[in-house]
């Protein structure tokens, strides 16, 4: 059995958020003919993985969902929760105020909505397009986010997120992990949560080793899983420093890079 961890945005789908037939066919072939189990490893919330999981028939082949950058791990078929790591509730006001001080916006999630104080934020609208989940405006983010959360998301222009990331690490770095998943998204998660550490836990549950794993990604929140995997693959559209740390660089997501990687690494 082979395990294949796939980032979604910038990797599995195009910038138009399309799963091409070439990539879909290659992944169905990998599962059907090469005993491969797919793990969708994304910063997206759980509901935003469903349509892709269904299109790829992941549940039928015993695959897994890893939303929130690995903050949760679920069996795709049964939805049984294998692991969950959550931000402590006392961190939410601190994160909120840091984000506000740096002129960015903060979001989080329910099962049905993206919570925000600002409905007119173009960066929040990008998350709506990516996840397919509607925004729900709340008068007070802090009062609305009263439960432990897998993550918050700071959104805004890169020039605001870079100093915000540094401030989070300086002031809350013993409890919060902060890393960019795009030029306008800063992920705020429990310390130690990343796709690599989550995959290491899943490998342990399954009795597998990193050499059984291929991981494909395009951004900084994919780096730990690319480095963990026996074969770490960077997309052709990934930043150069991500590509340098991968074992293999495939074509871009506009050129069916996932399918090309499988042709070179699995279908041989």
Q: Locations of the language-model features?
A:
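Short, structured coil segments at secondary-structure junctions
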Residues: 56, 61, 69, 172-174, ...
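Mg2+-dependent phosphoryl-transfer enzymes with acidic/Ser/Thr/Gly-rich catalytic loops
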Residues: 1-3, 20, 187-268
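Active-site phosphate-binding/coordination module
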Residues: 21-123
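Conserved acidic, metal-coordinating active-site core of Asp-based
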Residues: 98, 102-216, 237
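Short, well-ordered alpha-helical microsegments
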Residues: 46-50, 161, 222
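Hydrophobic packing residues within well-ordered alpha-helices of enzyme cores
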Residues: 23, 49-53, 164, 168, ...
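Asp-based phosphoryl-transfer active-site loop
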Residues: 2-17
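Short active-site oxyanion
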Residues: 35-39, 63, 151, 211-213, ...
């Amino acid at each position: 059995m082979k395990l294949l961890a796939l980032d979604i945005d910038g990797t599995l789908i195009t910038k138009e958020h399309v799963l091409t037939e070439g990539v879909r066919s290659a992944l169905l072939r990998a599962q059907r003919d090469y005993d491969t189990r797919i793990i969708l490893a994304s910063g997206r919330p759980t509901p935003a993985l469903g349509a892709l999981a269904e299109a790829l028939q992941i549940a039928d082949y015993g695959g897994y969902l890893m939303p929130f950058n690995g903050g949760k791990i679920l069996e795709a078929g049964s939805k049984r929760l294998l692991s969950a790591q959550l931000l402590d509730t006392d961190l939410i006001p601190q994160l909120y105020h840091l984000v506000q001080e740096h002129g960015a916006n903060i979001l989080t999630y329910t099962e049905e909505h993206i919570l925000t104080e600002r409905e007119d934020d173009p960066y929040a609208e990008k998350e709506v397009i990516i996840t397919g989940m509607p925004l729900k405006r709340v008068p007070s983010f802090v009062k609305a986010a009263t439960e432990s959360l897998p993550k918050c998301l700071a959104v805004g222009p890169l020039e605001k997120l870079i100093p915000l990331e540094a401030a989070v690490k300086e002031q809350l770095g013993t409890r919060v992990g902060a890393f960019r998943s795009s030029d306008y998204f800063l992920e705020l998660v429990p310390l130690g949560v990343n796709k690599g550490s989550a995959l290491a836990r899943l490998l342990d549950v399954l009795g597998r080793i990193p050499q059984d794993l291929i991981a494909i990604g395009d951004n900084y929140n994919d780096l730990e899983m690319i480095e963990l995997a026996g074969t770490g693959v960077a997309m052709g559209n990934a930043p150069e420093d991500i590509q340098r740390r991968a074992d293999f660089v495939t074509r871009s997501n506009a050129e069916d890079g996932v399918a090309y990687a499988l042709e070179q690494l699995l279908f041989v």
